[in-house]
């Protein structure tokens, strides 16, 4: 009888060590809710392993309590890993820059992460869990959902749920001088200027496509002449590189109908800035004469043919460098010189009026004053050919008026900048000077934010940040363009700007009786939308955006 009692007691003694997930149920329920709303880059297997660690039976209650203490930092790290927030590598790489932010700006950034609707929903979920857990074993449902999510992703990354045999849409475009046929470039099919997108969007296929893209881009460059023709007409090139301006920002600010946009001769409607940070953006623009390179290669020496302003210097254009700020934050001026090949002295900033203070407290100069100084300086040049790079940041997040800690209203700043630029255009027209002005934003300001990033955060170069308005205007022409701007809809990037400059190098566009605008703007290089920062890559594949963080799996960008 005694032996029988011991045998039946053994199973019950094992069951008593299965204590369930307890409070960790709420942790997983919150994750499921955020996942359902599209706010997480959820990793099913890691979460299942974490749940198994929490469920593993331990005979001693002290060990059970110790496990909970150990699980706290693990759970926090896993939650962070499941979000779209910047990873440790990004935070470390940007640490010195974050340290330069003013206290008021840091507080402003932190408050943007507070979503009261989300907090309210989590509170309701907490009450529901506390109520239902009195009668229902929530752990069973949590484990079942985790298992289901893992089954869904056995064949690929999270949310890559396309069947292997599903038909896909092939993106076929023609650009540059390419024919509308598939050609072989490094063993990969290429349609026009861009690698073909025929394979299903799995992680392996997207990685292969990205490698093919960079291999194809490495073979592209603008062809500058060795010298200008004897009858070439001198003119000036002014490239205005404005920070924090995208089509999404303009729409959010309600300035799509500003008259400035109707005054350009040429307008790029589908231009990709390829990054969401200032330093890399400036380097890409200054290296516009070669195809797009990876973020890492931006900080490696490039072929001499890649530097747009250096190419112009060889043809007799005098270089000028202007900034609407001091260029010190993040070593911006140093990057422009070392990686962008811009060796010209910074134009004198003495006595320029300060209209704003940056997020780090540095001065932001009045654009009208800077542009007027450019007019004065270049007018005194002995050389009538010049190429000027002007970087300005009146729209940067965190800019505020002197004596005021609150970030200045974006719409008011954008309205002022557009008005000033429009007035400058009028002044240039009156001057009679032959000038080609190219307005190229660095990147957008993330004015609206999305499910991955709050307003102002640009760690991930999303399409709404990198789709920027680019405009070209010619002044001093004998036969100026009439009517609405010529709109270029094809996917473009910096190589198209370089090619456009090459097409007008002889300056005859300013003296011709009739300008063939169609010939000037047709067949410019197309570039597939690929954007990259140090820890994030975003591509457009089969008309859908995909993102890869820290070299992990590709997932669809949350819409």
Curated annotation (Swiss-Prot):
Pfam families: CBP_BcsG. GO terms for cellular component: plasma membrane. The chain crosses the membrane at residues 34-54, 68-88, 113-133, 138-158. Keywords: Cell inner membrane, Cell membrane, Cellulose biosynthesis, Membrane, Transmembrane, Transmembrane helix. The keyword RNA-binding does not apply. GO terms for biological process: cellulose biosynthetic process. InterPro entries: BcsG (IPR017744). It is found in: Cell inner membrane. Coiled coil: none annotated. It comes from the Bacteria. It is a multi-pass membrane protein. Disruption phenotype: When the bcsEFG operon is disrupted in a cellulose-synthesizing strain (a strain K12 / W3110 derivative called AR3110 with a restored, functional bcsQ gene), cellulose is no longer made. Cellulose production is abolished in E.coli K12 / MG1655 and W3110 due to a premature stop codon in bcsQ. This is Cellulose biosynthesis protein BcsG. The gene is bcsG.
